[in-house]
Swiss-Prot record:
Removal of H(2)O(2), oxidation of toxic reductants, biosynthesis and degradation of lignin, suberization, auxin catabolism, response to environmental stresses such as wounding, pathogen attack and oxidative stress. These functions might be dependent on each isozyme/isoform in each plant tissue. Has a high preference for hydroxycinnamates as substrates. Substrate preference is ferulic acid > p-coumaric acid > N-acetyl tyrosine methyl ester > N-acetyl-tyrosine > tyrosine > catechol > Gly-Tyr-Gly. May be involved in the formation of diferulate linkages in the plant cell wall. InterPro entries: Haem_peroxidase, Haem_peroxidase_sf, Peroxidase_pln, Peroxidases_AS, Peroxidases_heam-ligand_BS, Secretory_peroxidase. Monomer. It is found in: Secreted. Ca(2+) 2 binds at T212, D257, T260, A263, D265. Ca(2+) 1 binds at D82, V85, G87, D89, S91. This is Cationic peroxidase SPC4. (indol-3-yl)acetate binds at T111. The record marks R77 as: Transition state stabilizer. Binds 1 heme b (iron(II)-protoporphyrin IX) group per subunit. Binds 2 calcium ions per subunit. It holds the Pfam family peroxidase. Substrate binds at P181. Optimum pH is 3.8 with 2.2'-azino-bis(3-ethylbenzthiazoline-6-sulfonic acid) as substrate, 5.5 with ferulic acid as substrate, and 6.5 with N-acetyl-L-tyrosine as substrate.
């Protein structure tokens, strides 16, 4: 299999997808089903305090993804990894402290894109300037940026409930490991994790469709290649993967969606039907009787996938949210507020870009 597209080619794909997605996104936003709203959230939360909040986030994401098509998957994954551990409270953004390492240092989060963290801080800073102070929470920025990343990649738009507040603490390393199952997990293990946060089999299949964009590292699926190919893996596809990953421990990446790696569409499910899912956690959705019918349904109908993804991601985005007087509105997304401090310097470490979406199912 060939490596990920060049930056120029990827940018061209992103631009085409952006143009094609506008009418579809508008229609989906106006007619999509909505799960019940968590108490304290609303669709017009910033109507008075920061009326341009959503347009500011949208504009930033559109421009940023045009320059780096891989950022869309990075922002979407960041929202997922935040919500699955301790709820949607932006705790994944917090740097470690004297009390211990932050969530970013846990194995499933080691390959979250540094550029995605930087983008959230950039957006938050822009909102601070445009809205006359720290008004919009980091957790709401995460939710909005994830939605706009889906849209700019050609996926459905959906209304994002707003009003989340930010946690003043991060989860333990063990809680991160418990909340983010590995890509080697099969459906029973995945459902066991999701059932603890009020997500079901339909949510699992729909949210896994986020793998229609992004990259996976060889080490995250090498168990399907060595010592012998997984029998659920298409033989031709297995051969392509072996050329990309010729030995265990190979430090290379490949698209999660072999057909349309930069477009948010239903081809991920077509891949599964053709036994071309990259991870065990992907392919087992088709192998397992409990989830197979949903994979078939989404492979046949992109509309059905988009409708369910929009519903499930909004449902996910309300897991254990902090509202009202709970938590805080951070002045710096990377650090809890200090008493009497209005703005803190950013502290997200700049490290080598990992560009890997693979050390966790989501």
């Amino acid at each position: 299999m060939s490596r990920a597209p060049t930056l120029a080619a990827a940018a061209a794909v992103a631009a085409v997808v952006l143009i094609c997605s506008s009418s579809t996104a508008t229609a989906a936003d106006g007619n999509a089903r909505q799960p019940p709203l968590a108490p304290g959230l609303s669709f017009d939360f910033y109507k008075r305090s920061c009326p341009k909040a959503e347009s500011i986030v949208r504009s930033f994401v559109q421009d940023a993804v045009r320059r780096d098509v891989g950022l869309a998957a990075g922002l979407l994954r960041l929202h997922f990894h935040d919500c699955f551990v301790q709820g949607c409270d932006a705790s994944v953004l917090l740097d470690g402290s004297a009390t211990g390492p932050g969530e970013q240092q846990a194995p499933p989060n080691l390959t979250l894109r540094p550029t995605a963290f930087k983008a959230i801080n950039d957006i938050h800073d822009r909102l601070h300037k445009e809205c006359g102070g720290t008004v919009v929470s980091c957790s709401d920025v995460l939710a909005l940026a994830a939605r706009d990343s889906v849209v700019v990649s050609g996926g459905p738009s959906y209304k994002v409930p707003l009003g989340r507040r930010d946690s003043a603490s991060f989860a333990t390393q063990q809680d991160v490991l418990s909340g983010l199952p590995p890509p080697t997990a099969a459906v029973p293990a995945l459902l066991a994790v999701l059932s603890k946060i009020n997500l079901d089999a339909t949510d699992l299949v729909a949210l896994s469709g986020g793998h229609t964009i992004g990259l996976g590292h060889c080490t995250s699926f090498e168990d399907r290649l060595f010592p012998r190919p997984d029998p659920t893996l298409n033989a031709t596809f297995a051969g392509q993967l072996r050329r990309t990953c010729p030995a265990k421990g190979t430090d290379r990446r490949t698209p999660l969606d072999v057909r349309t790696p930069n477009a948010f569409d239903n081809k991920y499910y077509v891949n599964l039907v053709n036994r071309e899912g990259l991870f065990t956690s992907d392919q087992d959705l088709f192998s397992n009787a409990r989830t197979r019918a949903l994979v078939d349904k989404f492979a046949r109908s992109q509309r059905d996938f988009f409708d369910q993804f929009a519903f499930s991601v909004v449902k996910m985005g309300q897991i254990k949210v902090l509202t009202g007087t709970q938590g805080q509105i951070r002045t710096n997304c990377s650090a809890r507020n200090a008493a009497g401090t209005t703005m803190l310097p950013w502290s997200v470490s700049v490290v080598e870009e990992a560009a890997d979406e693979s050390l966790g199912v989501f």
